[in-house]
């Protein structure tokens, strides 16, 4: 009887593509208007002066200048702002 037993199936073998999240421009770096500063899920970083928020919570520069990261308020939230160069 030269039979081979059937191989089992697996429920693994899938993975999603990486979303390339994180800080794209660090503190002290010069940026131009429209530059992406942070890609994030939710408000890990909050927008400060001259920083806009996209519909996917991406933070971007509204004007040219220098990136500044700081902690603000009683909750010590992380905030990103653009300082005029």
From Swiss-Prot:
Residues 1-27 are annotated as: Disordered. Keywords: Ribonucleoprotein, Ribosomal protein. GO terms for molecular function: structural constituent of ribosome. Pfam families: Ribosomal_L27. It comes from the Bacteria. GO terms for cellular component: cytosolic large ribosomal subunit. InterPro entries: Ribosomal_bL27 (IPR001684), Ribosomal_bL27_CS (IPR018261). PROSITE patterns: RIBOSOMAL_L27. GO terms for biological process: translation. The keyword Ribosomal protein applies. Transmembrane segments: none annotated. The keyword Ribosomal protein applies. Belongs to the bacterial ribosomal protein bL27 family. PANTHER family: LARGE RIBOSOMAL SUBUNIT PROTEIN BL27M (PTHR15893:SF0), RIBOSOMAL PROTEIN L27 (PTHR15893). NCBIfam families: L27. This is Large ribosomal subunit protein bL27. It comes from Halorhodospira halophila (strain DSM 244 / SL1) (Ectothiorhodospira halophila (strain DSM 244 / SL1)).
